[in-house]
Design a protein with these regions (language model features):
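Hydrophobic h-region of N-terminal signal peptides that target proteins for export
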Residues: 8-17
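Beta-propeller domains with acidic blade repeats across secreted/periplasmic ectodomains
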Residues: 55-56
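Mature N-terminal segment immediately following signal peptide/propeptide cleavage
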Residues: 20-48
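A flexible loop/linker signature enriched in serine peptidases of the S9 family
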Residues: 19-20, 38-44, 59-63, 78-88, ...
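Short coil/turn segments that connect the beta-strands within blades of beta-propeller domains
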Residues: 32-33, 71-73, 127-129, 171-173
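Positively charged n-region of N-terminal signal peptides that target proteins for export
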Residues: 1-4
Length: 197
């Protein structure tokens, strides 16, 4: 009996260790030639045709929501390195990220929060000069769309009441956007039924 218990305990520990190591490929984006995605908190790039993924970042912190520039040469992304979640920019080949935003720390500012992290990169303007991101100013339950220049100038709020994921029309004259942000709501974490055993 003791041997059976010990075997089950060891097997359970091995399964638990494997579960801790399991990580998801998240937040993919493409420029038509490559795909950039987050794995274990770092950014990777892989050819759209397949092949080996290249690790682009290895910083202490988390990178997510990467978006290629219209010319496909730069990547804007959201990262949390020092407690604040901010917008960063780097070449598509990797390198040292350039911080573009400097915002106040929100109490609830992580990927596990039901409202999601702050300063999520949404898209680029068609001319490649600005990056749109969603900011949850004042730690609120609604997000506002902001634009920051790739030169790092002062961000500007778009004249919209609320905003979430968005995309420009091919000519860059119109912006389609979601007013409600629900991508991190707790009901999306549902893992099973409510039926009796």
């Amino acid at each position: 009996m003791k041997k059976l218990f010990l075997a089950l305990l060891l097997a359970g520990g091995a399964v638990a260790a494997q579960a801790e190591e399991a990580r998801l490929l998240r937040f993919p984006a493409t420029n038509g030639k490559d795909v950039v995605f987050t794995y274990a908190g770092d950014l990777y790039r892989v050819p759209i045709a397949g092949g080996e993924a290249t690790r682009l970042t290895s910083h202490v912190g988390t990178e997510m929501f990467a978006r290629f520039s219209p010319d496909g040469q730069q990547i804007a992304f959201t990262a949390q390195y020092d407690g604040n979640t901010e917008v960063y920019l780097m070449p598509k080949t990797g390198g040292e990220p350039e911080r573009l935003t400097y915002t106040a720390t929100n109490e609830r500012d992580d990927i596990g929060d039901r409202m999601g992290p702050n300063n999520i990169v949404m898209t680029w303007t068609r001319d490649g000069k600005n990056i749109l991101y969603r900011n949850r100013i004042s730690d609120g339950f609604s997000g506002k769309l902001w634009s920051v220049s790739v030169e790092g100038d002062m961000p500007e709020q778009l004249p919209l009441p609320e905003g979430g994921f968005c995309s420009y029309s091919p000519d860059g004259k119109k912006l389609a956007y979601n007013r409600v942000m629900r991508e991190f709501r707790t009901w999306k974490y549902y893992k099973g039924g409510m039926a009796d055993d």
